[in-house]
Curated annotation (Swiss-Prot):
Pfam families: Dickkopf_N. One of its GO terms (cellular component) is extracellular region. GO terms for biological process: adrenal gland development; negative regulation of aldosterone biosynthetic process; negative regulation of canonical Wnt signaling pathway; negative regulation of cortisol biosynthetic process; negative regulation of DNA-templated transcription; Wnt signaling pathway. Its main location: secreted. This is Dickkopf-related protein 3. Residues 208-284 are annotated as: DKK-type Cys-2.
Length: 349
């Protein structure tokens, strides 16, 4: 029996051994089939995603156009409502305020109307005023304005007004276009219309509102290509300058009333703004004609106006008057002897 059991065990083992490598042929060739079969669904999914993105973009554009049309319809409806007020039917003294909310599409239109009528019993004069404020909100009835001032948007964003809405926009990096300092990220300033890291407040090209905002040697003036005034260096010899129709008045206004931006800056110290070649263009020229060396010494560097600040205001006015008188005398000398004699008579007086 033991021998028979051993024979049966050997037979079973011999039958089981060849069955082990049997699955190997299926493993070697089966991966070749699913490859192309798996690629088609992936390509189809990619195309579906592209079509879905295009559809979403078209829907978003249609939604924006629909919202714009609804806002225009709301404004027209508010205008019609205000025009329906009959002044004659109102009592002599009338005051009324109404606030209404109307659903227009997916938006809520808020209309606040104030009507006031006052009649003077003695003169019979009637004063009528009407104020209509219209705003459009979203589906939840909230106002579309996201912010009012820059501080409402946080440190890395600023408040921008566009398309009749105030929204928070991300700050702009270095060398990007700007119109305000708050549009630039971090400690950057808007200089010459671009966000700049190295700019200092009141420095060359920084935004200004009046002359006090600029550092010495600079003046607040408008520049071509910019919609706002910037701190500009005082022009030197040969550069365009502020029209000196009344040089003394300009000097006093700039020294005593440093408010408001100019179209062009006045000349640096030692220079006069004079017409160039009998034209309407004014350029900075030396104050003492024929003394070129003296004018070069008296020219004020753009960034170092220390000598200009040390001179007192009275002395500066006196110097401007003397320079103006000398310049007029030399210009009149070319016209004939009569003007020279009359000018000499004035000097003797």
């Amino acid at each position: 029996m033991q021998r028979l059991g051993g024979i049966l065990l050997c037979t079973l083992l011999a039958a089981a051994v060849p069955t082990a490598p049997a699955p190997s042929p299926t493993v070697t060739w089966t991966p070749a089939e699913p490859g192309p079969a798996l690629n088609y669904p992936q390509e189809e999914a990619t195309l579906n995603e592209m079509f879905r993105e295009v559809e979403e973009l078209m829907e978003d554009t249609q939604h924006k156009l629909r919202s714009a049309v609804e806002e225009m319809e709301a404004e027209e409806a508010a205008a019609k409502t205000s025009s329906e007020v009959n002044l004659a039917s109102l009592p002599p003294n009338y005051h009324n305020e109404t606030s209404t909310e109307t659903r227009v599409g997916n938006n809520t239109v808020h209309v606040h109307q104030e009507v006031h009528k006052i009649t003077n019993n003695q003169s019979g004069q009637v004063v009528f005023s009407e104020t209509v404020i219209t705003s459009v909100g979203d589906e939840e009835g909230k106002r579309s304005h996201e912010c009012i001032i820059d501080e409402d948007c946080g440190p890395t964003r600023y408040c921008q007004f566009s398309s009749f809405k105030y929204t928070c926009q991300p700050c702009r990096d270095q060398q990007m276009l700007c119109t305000r300092d708050s549009e630039c990220c971090g400690d950057q300033l808007c200089a010459w219309g671009h966000c700049t890291q190295k700019a200092t407040k009141g420095g060359n090209g920084t935004i200004c509102d009046n002359q006090r905002d600029c550092q010495p040697g600079l003046c607040c003036a408008f520049q071509r290509g910019l919609l706002f005034p910037v701190c500009t260096p005082l022009p030197v010899e040969g550069e365009l300058c502020h029209d000196p129709t009344s040089q003394l008045l300009d000097l006093i206004t700039w020294e005593l009333e440093p408010e408001g931006a100019l179209d062009r800056c006045p000349c640096a110290s030692g220079l006069l703004c004079q017409p160039h070649s009998h034209s309407l263009v004014y350029m900075c020229k030396p104050a003492f004609v024929g003394s070129h060396d003296h004018s070069e010494e008296s020219q004020l560097p753009r960034e170092a106006p220390d000598e200009y600040e040390d001179v007192g205001f009275i002395g500066e006015v006196r110097q401007e008057l003397e320079d103006l008188e000398r310049s007029l005398a030399q210009e009149m000398a070319f016209e004939g002897p009569a003007p020279v004699e009359s000018l000499g008579g004035e000097e003797e007086i």
